[in-house]
A protein has these predicted regions:
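Membrane-embedded alpha-helical bundles that constitute the cytochrome b-like, heme-associated redox core
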Residues: 1-137
Length: 137
């Protein structure tokens, strides 16, 4: 049985990851619709880093919750596996963005764009799966 103290951490996990999703969406909207402004790239970078930091903070809360309740057993279920994938993607995507700015390679730009789209899509799917887990309690 999961202790009440562990369950009490769930809102922090949800808040941090969902905030990260909203911040990343703002960064994507900035890149898509505000390119005519001089400040769009700085805003896009700032929002991307802030969104990744918030998301990773929320994932760290989840890792603590799982390790405190299940020990060293790896998490099971689609929500956990997508969460692991998202944690990798929110590091990979900004990294590719910074590299593509230095190299000016269109292939890297496409990888950065698609990685961002996939990351946001996975986060939306995982938010739904997380909500289904919470509803089952």
């Amino acid at each position: 049985m999961i202790s009440d103290k562990i369950i009490m951490l769930y809102p922090f996990h949800a808040f941090l990851v969902f905030s990260g999703l909203l911040i990343l969406l703002a960064g994507m909207i900035c890149a898509r619709y505000l390119k005519g402004r001089r400040w769009w790239l700085k805003a896009h970078k700032t929002l991307g880093i802030a969104g990744a930091a918030s998301t990773l903070s929320g994932i760290m809360v989840a890792v603590y919750m799982v390790s405190a309740s299940a020990g060293l057993n790896p998490p099971a279920g689609l929500h956990a596996y997508i969460g692991i994938t998202v944690s990798i993607m929110v590091i990979f995507t900004p990294f590719m963005g910074f590299i593509q700015l230095k190299k000016r390679d269109m292939r890297l730009r496409a990888i950065h764009r698609w990685a961002g789209r996939i990351t946001i899509a996975l986060m939306i799917i995982n938010a739904y799966l997380g909500w289904m887990i919470v509803r089952s309690f």
